[in-house]
Amino acid sequence: MISFIVCLLLLITGYLTYGKIVDKTFGPDDRETPAVRINDGVDYVVMPQWKLFLVQLLNIAGLGPIFGALQGALWGPVVFLWITFGTIFAGGVHDYFSGMISERNDGASIAEVTGKYLGHTMQNIMRVFSVVLLIMVGTVFAVGPAGLIVTLCKSNGVSGVLSTTLFWLILILVYYFIATFISIDKIIGKVYPLFGMCLIIMAVGVIIGIFTNPNYTIPEIWSHLYNMHPSGTPVWSFMFITVACGAISGFHSTQSPLMARCMKNEKQGHFVFYGAMVAEGIIALIWAAAGCALYEVTGGLNTGLAEALAGGQSAAIYDVCSKTMGGVGIALAMIGVVICPITSGDTAFRSARLTLSDWFHMDQSSYANRLKLCIPVLGIGAILGIGNATGLIDYTVIWRYFSWTNQTLAMIVLWAAAMYLFTEKKNFWMAAVPATFMSAVSCTYFILAPECLGSLLNSKTADGTVIYNTAVAYPIGIVFAALLLALFIRATKKRSAKKSA
């Protein structure tokens, strides 16, 4: 329990200290923000700081810090270290700069921001990359909740059309269309802060339930400095990829521009962007602690948690909430597993619309222009979702690559932030160091993961246990990261030479 408390205090201290250093390095001032200067009444709308924070938290979180943290807890309390230091030095930096650099560029989507600092080729790659990722996220966060609602309906004796996935999927997609089309302050700005509060209350309830129950003990890091994963999956770099949103996530960079278009003052950035990431880190830390404390450890391995997760991640959330909060927890769990994914899904589609509008320079104050983008974006989502629900399409093959693409996106955004800082003659190492680290993480995972190159390089024992080829993957990951750092330094020298010429 001491480990947990220390990590919690470090996260809070990190926000108050390193977060301030990051903010000071960027240098927010009193210039007019895009929300004030452009104010189109659709995407550029001034919202109060507390709403910006809660909407940003819900947009970047959803169930990410819960699912990822519970999965990360399979490796044991060592996951506390990554959540804590990853949030402070990587995730917070990533989210802050993706939001604030966007704000300095009229609220531009992350693809446009990246292109400005990493070149036109990277811009086009990021445009396609972002739109595909966002539509996939939106679709998955429509199909998932629809299936959960059907399960709840059937368990309560509901039959007929209300017990079909197709009905609820269409209903969710219709809502997504409305939320993607209308002004950001009509639904997202009014309702989402309430759900953001629910996410926080659920986490607080879980940790209070653990602290007040003598049967639950959060293990200490120093007593479990070994791999507790039942399958023996390597800590590096699987844990770093699995935790995702609880420490750093590239998806956040697609969401930050939404709030960058709604800030009244640049000085709100520290609380809205860095603060929301720290809040998500705290939520992830709590759920990781729950995963470590509530389930049986057999032979030094987290077998109990593995069994709980085998029943489905939503079932695991339900189990944790019921054990720690009883009936209230069950109600919160139901809200969480249904509402939170939906709130990430609609903003994913909205971000896809904005990415395309920036790409093709389409004014979004026009109803016609918004329809021109909403219809194809939601249309593709509907085809994928309904096709999957009816068994005609299986997009899970593409979705398997989400973990890798998500953190690769984070890596690219950090390199863009580093180049921005260099261009502005500021401490670029603040972003370059985590960018280098995430480059090693992303490359190593790509080599080891079964859905990537792992199926070719790894081997199996007679009982089916995977033997990961770390002897090849680890050196390649390190060399790849060092190479990108060298290329970055070379690019900075070229820019300096051009300026002095």
Where in this protein do the model-derived segments appear?
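Hydrophobic alpha-helical segments and their helix-loop junctions in multi-pass secondary transporters
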Residues: 138-156, 165-168, 180, 199-227, ...
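Membrane-interface loop-to-helix entry segments
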Residues: 9-27, 129, 145-149, 165-212, ...
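Helix-loop-helix module between adjacent transmembrane segments
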Residues: 10-11, 15, 56, 90-106, ...
